[in-house]
């Protein structure tokens, strides 16, 4: 299971530490030859401290055998945990390869073209960049930290980004046509950002997927080859195909509808194109009405004075929950008011879905994969 010191320690241990001892592979030290390749991950050990471990910190005692995974599992990926505790998703090499091959076919990417990886390989989006490069017969260009100017000068043909990274490229007003393709995944992007990037020459492909589908399985609303998508009567998106995962590391049941994996996302299909509405477990119950937080986020993201936004529910004795908009202003000296945002929502959303509270912030707390950390946001309000 690939990991990073930026993973939250406690929820990460819940994923990687079922009964039995575990090991932590210090890949950087192993490759450079100046440290141990494998270190024990002890209960209570903080992930940030693991990176600082050296041979003198390891007592060398042999470890007893721990719990294993099925033979076909190539990697265990921790989900982002954007709305709750992360899960360990078991992926086979066949699933990873099926996803990467379908992606290359859809993009028309030729063998020998290079991929830039500036997403954490501990997340499925970053890992799949490496797999696509492998299938392309090239060595990936890897940037451990995101530097917009280095990204533009990387010489790579394709790159996978999250909206926050794309926003930083757009701020430079640089020529984005240097990439044959920019895959955009993670959190939903505000409509204005996509338009601004395309005006700068970006050839954008928006993606939908998750760890359980080996990454993006729907490009620009249409499923990849050999992937089937439908929406059930409950509004949840279902996915079938060779890209699906083998199960959860913890052994918890996989939500299924026959051969279909039932996601936690709500969506609608029109003309064979999928539109993602938001997460089913991110619904705000206010005054007896159900509000999909993702739908409100999408609308508010189109306001010209909003640079970034997240929508969460806050417990309220009168309404049960109230809709709270956490906004990063486009111009901090002239932030939008609650009245302006509610007026903007008036002809775009039902009245009960408009935010009742506004919190201004210089930046949203983000997870390593670029998604807003909604658990942390809820705790802050």
Predicted regions and their residues:
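Conserved pre-ATP/AMP-binding loop-to-beta segment of ANL
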Residues: 12-14, 18-19, 61-78, 108-114
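Conserved AMP-binding A3 loop
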Residues: 73-101
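Conserved ATP/PPi-binding loop(s) of AMP-dependent carboxylate-activating enzymes
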Residues: 223, 232-259, 279, 291
């Amino acid at each position: 299971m690939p990991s990073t010191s930026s993973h939250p320690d406690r929820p990460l241990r819940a994923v990687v530490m079922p009964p039995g001892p575990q090991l932590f592979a210090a890949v950087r030290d192993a490759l450079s030859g100046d440290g141990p390749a494998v270190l024990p991950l002890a209960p209570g050990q903080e992930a940030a401290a693991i990176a600082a471990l050296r041979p003198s910190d390891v007592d060398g005692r042999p470890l007893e055998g721990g719990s294993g995974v099925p033979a076909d599992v190539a990697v265990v990926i921790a989900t982002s945990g954007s709305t709750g505790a992360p899960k360990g998703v078991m992926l086979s090499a066949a699933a990873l390869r099926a996803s990467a091959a379908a992606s290359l076919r859809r993009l028309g990417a030729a063998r020998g073209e290079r991929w830039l990886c500036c997403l954490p390989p501990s997340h499925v989006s970053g890992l799949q960049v490496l797999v696509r490069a492998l299938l392309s017969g090239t060595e990936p260009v890897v940037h451990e930290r995101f530097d917009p100017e280095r990204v533009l000068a990387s010489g790579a043909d394709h790159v996978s980004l999250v909206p926050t990274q794309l926003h930083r490229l757009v701020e430079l007003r640089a020529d984005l046509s240097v990439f044959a393709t920019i895959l955009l995944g993670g959190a939903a992007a505000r409509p204005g950002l996509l338009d601004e990037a395309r005006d700068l020459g970006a050839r954008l492909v928006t993606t939908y997927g998750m760890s359980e589908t080996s990454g993006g399985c729907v490009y620009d609303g249409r499923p990849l080859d050999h992937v089937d998508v439908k929406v059930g009567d409950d509004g949840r998106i279902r996915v079938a195909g060779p890209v699906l995962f083998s199960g959860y590391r913890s052994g918890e049941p996989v939500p299924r509808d026959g051969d279909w994996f039932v996601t936690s996302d709500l969506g609608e299909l029109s003309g064979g194109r999928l539109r993602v509405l938001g997460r089913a477990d991110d619904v705000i119950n206010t005054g007896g009405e159900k509000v999909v937080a993702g739908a409100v986020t999408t609308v508010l993201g189109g306001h010209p004075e909003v640079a970034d936004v997240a929508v969460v529910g806050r417990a309220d004795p009168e309404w049960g929950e109230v809709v709270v908009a956490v906004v990063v202003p486009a111009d901090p000296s002239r932030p939008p008011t609650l009245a302006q945002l509610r007026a903007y929502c008036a002809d775009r959303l039902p009245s009960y879905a408009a935010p009742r509270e506004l919190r201004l912030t210089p930046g949203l707390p983000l997870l390593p994969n670029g998604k807003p950390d909604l658990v942390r946001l809820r705790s802050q309000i």
